[in-house]
From Swiss-Prot:
Keyword Lipid metabolism: no
MF annotations from Gene Ontology: exoribonuclease II activity; RNA binding
Protein name in the entry: Exoribonuclease 2
Organism per entry: Vibrio parahaemolyticus serotype O3:K6 (strain RIMD 2210633)
Family: Belongs to the RNR ribonuclease family. RNase II subfamily.
Length: 668
């Protein structure tokens, strides 16, 4: 009788229109119900029946009404769906195809699915990894959720899954770009390449490196200064801005480095062969010569030129470090000529490092964590590699080269691809002064730390403090590093200018700078200048690559450390973040990140306080842990599905002593 009654429908609509509405995000729970989060302090309960219309993370408009004496939200209108393209796993439900999203909050969802036209059902089995797209949503007028599978990533039990799934998740390629049959040299007709094959350049890289893009030569003068020459591989000799390969390089932005494998920005035949500075092979290069004083000051005689060079020795970091640090290396014995060059390069690097320590900012030494994998993609070991003397030698050479490029591009064109950093966020400067200089006895003022020199002085001061607590606090108040086409300073390095050009095989921004440096050499207008979008594009690529690297690492850590909770293995954790729920620590033995919930420190909310603003954890108002502290921990849980680690301290905090009464005192 009441079905399809227009008057009833109109009445219902009027009632709904008069009810208050709120906009917010959906937060799902494991129990079927959820919440509409309007802001950090306001949320409304969503009963299970209404939750069936939405997904965790959806942005919606909901009607707020009272049911059973409780305010509840009924989602009505979809503003933005949280799930569009996503990664999931195949689940067969009563013989029908479903997909379960690979997301911690969505793993209880099983969404009905179909295959995109052209995909074969026989290729899909329970647990297989797929790319799917949400094509129907109840808040869009559809009856139910429905997804379309657009591609299969890999089989359920494939050990390569961490890499392929993560790359698909971030919409990144999983292979190198296709090469071409014949690469041709496309130099400007006026570009003269100086014949420098007789100069004994050396390359220093990892033992397995194939894309060697920098070669070095140094000569110490009678006065004790250093004449440094840096030669960099020249892929822009083969790729012009109009080439299809240039578009591919720009779309990729960088070579992707993941644990155990990389995906090159350029085809391997170019990156690992034609442009790689292989020992004994003649290669086109862009070179820079500069004099660096014995005090580490970069001279004004910076000169860029094109050349044909030949590497005279392909050296490895560890062998060179052993030789420099111990006087010999079991694996490598240099000729007298190469020994002199390496020694001069090393002395140059010490002079530059000392200058930077006094006048700029030197980042603290932290290990690089490296996964050693078997052919079957199992983790054999996790190595903590410290940066040694040969690594620092190359690093100082590259920093010097990039300062030279920055100065040259600023002077000649007032543009280029610059790495910049703005120091502290302006709104946080007063807070930083209060933190480091509460009594006003130190040199740091709001005016001084807003300048490059003052910020660098602050970072140098923080580096020599007894603990890293203040350093960790202040890092949160810093701006992010950026890439842009304006010649702005790099506060975090303490440098007034910085433009990278030393990795053109691996970075698209370096290819642009190569073209601009060639314009300097030719005294012409550049064939390519960086547009206003390129910096944002590169920053976005870098962000996705870092997320991918972290996700693969988390997956491998969860695999590798799965048995540690039962073994109760002790690790050393360094606290790098504190929020109201607990602390995040880095395991110094292997680089894994783990979360310590407050309840696993002390299961008493009245007594424990985790304060994210101050970066402290207190028990009974007394600070027991703070940012930068190291503590002994054991793993309490390794969640393979979510790829997350939960840890707890080995230190046990006692129950609160019973309050003493007059009677107990007199008895004593």
């Amino acid at each position: 009788m009441f079905q399809d009654n227009p008057l009833l429908a109109q009445l219902k609509q009027q009632i709904q229109e008069n009810l208050p509405k709120k906009e917010g995000s959906i937060k799902a729970t494991d129990k079927g119900f959820g919440f509409l989060e309007v802001d950090s302090k306001t949320s409304f309960f969503i009963p299970p029946a209404y939750m069936k219309k939405c997904i965790h993370g959806d942005k919606v408009v909901a009607i707020i009404r009272t049911e059973n004496e409780r305010e509840v939200a009924e989602p009505q209108e979809l503003i933005e769906q949280s799930l569009t393209r996503f990664i999931g796993r195949v689940k067969m439900f009563k013989g029908k195809l479903n997909v379960v999203p690979d997301h911690p909050q969505l793993k209880k969802l099983s969404l009905k699915a179909k295959l995109k036209k052209g995909l074969k059902p026989d290729n899909f089995a329970e647990g297989d990894w797929v790319v799917a797209h949400l094509v129907r949503h109840p808040l869009k007028g559809d009856n139910t959720f429905f997804v379309e599978i657009s591609e299969k990533i890999t089989d359920a039990d494939d050990k390569i899954a961490p890499w392929w799934v993560t790359l698909a998740q971030n919409d990144l390629p999983n292979s190198e770009p296709a090469g071409i049959e014949n690469w041709e040299l496309k130099d400007d007709a006026d570009l003269e390449r100086i014949e420098m094959t007789h100069v004994p350049f050396v390359t220093i890289d990892g033992e397995s490196t194939k894309d060697m893009d920098d070669a070095l030569y140094a000569k110490k003068t009678e006065s004790g200064d250093f004449e440094l020459t840096i030669a960099i591989a020249d892929p822009t000799a083969y790729i012009t801005p109009e080439d299809e390969m240039d578009k591919v390089a720009r779309e990729r932005g960088y070579t992707i480095y993941l644990p155990g494998r990389n995906i090159p920005m350029l085809p391997r035949d170019l990156a690992d062969n034609l442009c790689s500075l292989i020992e004994g092979e003649i290669r086109p290069a862009i070179c820079c010569t500069v004099t660096v004083s014995k005090d580490g000051v970069i001279g004004d005689d910076i000169k860029f030129f094109a050349a044909n060079i030949k590497s005279h020795a392909r050296l490895a970091y560890d062998h060179v470090s052993d030789w420099l640090e111990n006087g010999n290396s079991d694996a490598w014995q240099p000729s007298e000529e190469i020994a002199t060059i390496v020694r001069d390069l090393y002395e140059f690097s010490l002079a530059r490092a000392e200058w930077r320590e006094k006048n700029a900012v030197v980042f603290p030494d932290r290990p690089d964590y490296r996964f050693e994998l078997s052919e079957d993609n199992d983790v054999i070991a996790i190595h903590a590699d410290m940066r040694r003397s040969a690594n620092r030698l190359v690093e100082e050479s590259m920093i010097t080269a990039n300062i030279c490029a920055g100065r040259t591009l600023r002077e000649k064109f007032e543009t280029g691809v610059f790495n910049t950093h703005a120091g502290l966020k302006p709104e946080k400067i007063e807070e930083v002064v209060q933190l480091v200089n509460p009594e006003g006895t130190l040199e740091f003022t709001a005016e001084s730390i807003a300048t490059l020199e003052g910020f660098a002085a602050l970072r140098r001061w923080l580096a020599v403090q007894e603990t890293s607590y203040l350093d960790n606090r202040i890092r949160k108040f810093q701006a992010y590093s950026e890439v842009g086409n304006q010649p702005l300073p790099h506060y975090a390095m303490g440098l007034d200018i910085y433009a990278t050009w030393t990795s053109p095989i691996r970075k698209y921004g370096d290819m642009i700078n190569h073209r601009m440096l060639k314009a300097v050499i030719l005294d012409k207008e550049p064939v390519q200048k960086p547009d206003d979008q390129v910096g944002e594009e590169l920053a976005l690529h870098r962000k996705h690559h870092k997320i991918a690297e972290r996700n693969v690492s988390d997956w491998l850590y969860a695999r590798t450390l799965a048995d540690e909770p039962s073994k109760q293995t002790c690790f050393t954790g360094e606290i790098f973040d504190i929020n109201r729920a607990g602390a995040r620590v880095r395991l110094l033995e292997n680089g894994a990140a783990a979360f310590i919930p407050g309840a696993l420190i002390l299961d008493n909310k009245e007594r424990i306080e985790c304060n994210g603003d101050n970066g402290t954890i207190s028990i009974d108002k007394e600070v027991v842990y703070k940012l930068g502290d190291t503590l002994e921990i054991v793993l309490a849980d390794v969640n393979q599905e979510n790829r997350s680690l939960v840890a707890k301290p080995t230190q046990v905090f006692a129950d609160q002593p019973a309050p003493q009464t007059e009677q107990t005192v007199s008895e004593e």
